[in-house]
Design a protein with these regions (language model features):
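N-terminal helicase ATP-binding lobe
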Residues: 1-565
Length: 565
């Protein structure tokens, strides 16, 4: 008689399944016994943000005394003191929190909604509070993210005297003993070139940027210079989901880097395929993407036409996100303006007090006829990187408050800006004029669906997904971090040597390859000036093997030329 296969336990898979069962039960059934059992499951898996939401929504009387006692005990075991209050953490957050004090280098890979930046910013602020002298750098990839991080740190450190928090790459004229710089890698590069800086803690947000061409090399250069200045530097690298941190640690001189990773999100995220059947007017057919395939959910009959592909994205958002905030992906600034304009005709003037103020600001300081001024009054806006800082921040704040209901955005929001929404809408896996997007970028954006502590689930609506050239949302995808410097040396070795010899690629026409070659050559020349070139190259095991191969190839060619001569 055949024995059944032994049961295997996979913590992440089984925890996700248990959490999904509990959250789905709560969404569909509010009976007291369902609420009690779901709360018990969520406590078992350490999903305390969802429990906090339930405590606001359901009275404690919906559970028995023993259940409530057990939940409180579990919360107590996972609680730490943050800003003077006992705060329960998820299992993953608690694990990271315990690891940070003793690790010289830590990499944290987790979904957008897992709360990794919360833990790291709290750790940074805790050190700034208790240490007499402390210098930290928080590296963020975009200017849009700098303001948000600066605000979070300043808010956390309210009441703590003599701590400077700055996004300006200049030394403190007051020479305070505790300083926190919040900078892009370019700004940090300027600071390191102008002043000698000994840093105790560096945090790299969106660390997958190490693979981002010449910008990745600037980031690597900054990290190496910080470590050279202070060998005891503590480094924390954050990414929304990434592989390759061990390799990154070796190449950055952090061979003992501790990697903490999870794919669990405290919020249930549904990927919903939105399809229009040919010949059937005013209907969206919805199906759920799961690990085992696609399951039909049902049909939504619309009040608007759905036949035109150019307006279908906006129509889908209007019909399927009638409550809650929605992020809508656009391929570029022009596309963002075009799509956002499609919302206005079907949206009434909003009653918010802040939106007329934003509208007037746009008219007075940008242009009286700028289309965004009229849009915001309807609770609609577009968002991209090349916008005035004050305007961009005002739009983000209005979206967080719920005054702006539909925000049409470009890839600017893919990196770090904390703008979760109840729903996310995507209708293409490309950017610009059809350039394919890396699947991990789309998953990072989709991870903004579901506001932690405000709802149990978020929805990612994939419009016309059946027609996409690729299917990147079928299964989870991570960034594969290969530092741009080592990749450029391997792929363009001869060109880098020529650049070092003085034959730099021309600045025009500008290509990504030329920029990478110039940056790699510049990094090596900078290291040569400090006699540290060998230290950098010795970390690149793949490069050493490549150089051996190149040497043997050149010898073979030399011998061959002698024999034929």
């Amino acid at each position: 008689m055949n024995q059944p296969p032994p049961l295997t336990f996979n913590y992440e898979r089984d925890t996700l399944l248990a959490q999904t069962i509990a959250l789905c039960a709560l969404i569909t059934n509010h009976e007291p016994n369902v609420v009690e059992r779901s709360k018990s499951i969520l406590a078992n898996v350490g999903n305390y943000p969802a429990l906090a939401y339930l405590e606001k929504r359901f009275s404690k009387g919906s559970s028995t005394f023993l259940t409530e006692l057990r939940i409180e005990l579990l919360k107590e075991l996972n609680s730490v003191e943050i800003d003077g209050k006992e705060t329960p953490l998820t299992e993953f957050q608690y694990d990271v929190w315990r690891t940070l004090p003793s690790a010289a280098a830590t990499a944290v890979s987790a979904p957008t909604s897992a709360g990794k930046s919360f833990i790291v910013i709290e750790y940074l602020c805790n050190r700034a509070t208790i240490e007499k002298t402390f210098t930290s750098v928080f590296i963020a990839p975009t200017r849009a993210l700098l303001s948000e991080v600066q605000h979070r740190i300043e808010k956390r450190l309210e009441g703590v005297a003599d701590v400077r928090v700055s996004t300006v790459p200049a030394p403190d004229v007051q020479a305070r003993n505790r300083q926190i710089y919040v900078l892009t890698q370019e700004r940090l590069h300027v600071l390191l070139s102008a002043a000698k800086l000994s840093v105790d803690l560096v945090v790299v947000d969106e660390a997958q940027g190490l693979a981002d061409g010449s910008r990745g090399m600037i980031l690597q250069d900054c990290l190496e210079r910080l470590r050279n200045e202070n060998p005891k530097l503590q480094a924390i690298l954050l990414a929304p989901g990434a592989n390759g941190f061990i390799r990154v640690g070796e190449q950055l001189g952090m061979p003992g880097i501790v990697v903490k990773e999870t794919e669990l999100s405290p919020v249930l995220q549904n990927r919903v395929q939105v399809t229009v059947k040919q010949g059937i007017a005013k209907q969206f057919h919805l199906s759920l993407l799961t690990l085992t395939g696609t399951r039909e959910i049902g049909v939504v009959t619309t009040t608007r036409g759905v036949a035109d592909p150019s307006t279908r994205l906006a129509v889908a958002a209007l019909e399927l996100a009638k409550s809650g905030a929605a992020l809508v992906y656009a391929t570029g600034p022009a596309d963002a303006e075009r799509v956002s304009a499609q919302f206005v005709a079907d949206r009434p003037i909003a009653t918010s007090d802040s939106l007329p103020q934003i509208s007037n600001f746009i008219k007075q300081h940008i242009h009286p006829d700028y289309g965004l001024a009229a849009m915001v009054r309807h609770g609609v806006a577009f968002h991209y990187g090349n916008m005035p800082k004050l305007l961009r921040e005002a739009l983000e704040d209005a979206f967080r408050r719920g005054d702006i209901r539909y925000l049409v955005c470009t890839t600017t929001l893919f990196q770090g800006v904390n703008l979760p929404a109840q729903s996310v809408f995507i209708n293409t896996p490309t950017r610009g004029k059809g350039t394919p997007l890396e699947a991990a970028h789309l998953w990072n954006f989709a991870g903004r669906a579901g506001r932690l502590g405000q709802e149990l689930a978020g929805n990612v609506f994939l419009v016309d997904y059946e027609d996409w050239a690729t299917k990147p949302m079928n299964e989870s995808s991570k960034f594969d971090i290969v530092p741009s410097f080592s990749e450029t040396i391997s792929d363009h070795f001869d060109a880098v040597l020529e650049a070092i010899a003085g034959k730099m690629p021309k600045r025009s026409p500008r290509t990504p390859e030329h920029a990478r070659i110039r940056a790699a050559a510049g990094l090596l020349l900078a290291r040569a000036s400090t006699k540290s070139t060998s230290r950098v190259l010795n970390r690149l095991s793949t490069l050493v093997e490549f150089l051996n191969f190149r040497m043997h190839s050149l010898l073979f060619r030399h011998v061959a030329s002698l024999s034929t001569g």
